[in-house]
């Protein structure tokens, strides 16, 4: 669970003032103003102690909650020492609230104070990636596999870097309808040592026909079935590709383990003997038809003829 963010409520419309906490402070001031910090300490302690009426568990005790990210995309314009102090105050508040779950902090912003992130007791660090860009206003065309070939972390030499877990709090190769990009992107994350990978964002079914959630993203199994299959295959990549495992550079890395991605065919595939998943029509033969336990796809394959447009 991400405990806090400091954005308005209006996207894509204008914000509507509600008198909430986020309207009392500027996005950057909220992390430096003493009164605001004190309020956040009280808030985060109350949040983890909150009892979910449906489960009967406080968030800090819920077995289905694995940890907390303290802030979504914080703003730290000050010094390393000021940033470290801010984080430590939040950590102390959580400790007093008897939280024992792992705690993470966003490190993909404010890199001038990056040293502070690794000089605290947070167990994990969170990152994001939009390798194709964002908010282009149209569906982009082309081969974007080179764009997802590497994920370089410029501050990986900082003291303490390798002692923190690495999590992706959001990613998307946005502004396109291709199905070949998700598995390649997740492969690159695993090569870079990431242990948790979150795609942003899935369109709710009631609005998915119109792509009105956050238009730069578009993903829903009913309306973008090829992309949804690509993400399904990417989930398998996250489990099957080893942390730090490398497959060379593009185009050699379009074939890796039991996976294949192709820009020309707009295709992602998993073919491991027991599972045969494909995001578009393919001529690939399953490794062993007699051992298949799961088939999922769009279009046709040597084992399924399908003329529909869904999955």
Q: Residue spans of the language-model regions?
A:
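Extracytoplasmic/secreted cell-surface and envelope-processing proteins
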Residues: 9-10, 78, 113, 135-136, ...
């Amino acid at each position: 669970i991400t405990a806090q963010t400091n954005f308005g409520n209006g996207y894509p419309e204008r914000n509507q003032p509600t008198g909430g906490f986020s309207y009392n402070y500027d996005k950057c001031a909220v992390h430096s103003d003493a009164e605001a910090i004190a309020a956040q300490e009280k808030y985060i302690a109350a949040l983890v102690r909150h009892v979910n009426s449906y489960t009967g568990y406080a968030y800090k005790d819920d077995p289905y909650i694995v940890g907390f990210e303290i802030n979504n995309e914080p703003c730290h314009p000050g010094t390393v020492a000021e940033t470290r102090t801010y984080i430590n105050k939040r950590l102390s508040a959580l400790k007093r609230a008897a939280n024992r779950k792992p705690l993470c902090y966003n490190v993909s912003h404010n890199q001038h104070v990056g040293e502070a992130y690794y000089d605290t007791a947070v167990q994990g660090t969170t990152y994001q990636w939009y390798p194709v860009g964002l908010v282009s206003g149209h569906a982009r065309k082309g081969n974007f596999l080179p764009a997802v070939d590497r994920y370089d972390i410029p501050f990986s030499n900082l003291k303490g870097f390798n002692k923190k877990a690495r999590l992706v709090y959001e990613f998307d190769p946005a502004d396109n309808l291709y199905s070949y990009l998700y598995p390649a992107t997740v492969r690159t994350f695993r090569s870079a040592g990431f242990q948790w990978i979150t795609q942003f964002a899935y369109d709710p079914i009631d609005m998915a026909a119109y792509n009105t959630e956050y238009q730069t993203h578009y993903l829903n199994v009913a309306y973008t079935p090829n992309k949804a299959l690509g993400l399904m295959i990417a989930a398998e990549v996250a489990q099957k590709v080893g942390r730090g495992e490398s497959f060379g550079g593009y185009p050699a890395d379009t074939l890796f383990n039991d996976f294949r991605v192709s820009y020309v065919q707009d295709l992602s595939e998993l073919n491991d003997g027991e599972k045969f998943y494909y995001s578009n029509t393919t001529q690939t033969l399953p490794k062993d038809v007699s051992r298949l336990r799961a088939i999922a796809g769009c279009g046709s394959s040597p084992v399924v003829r399908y003329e529909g447009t869904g999955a």
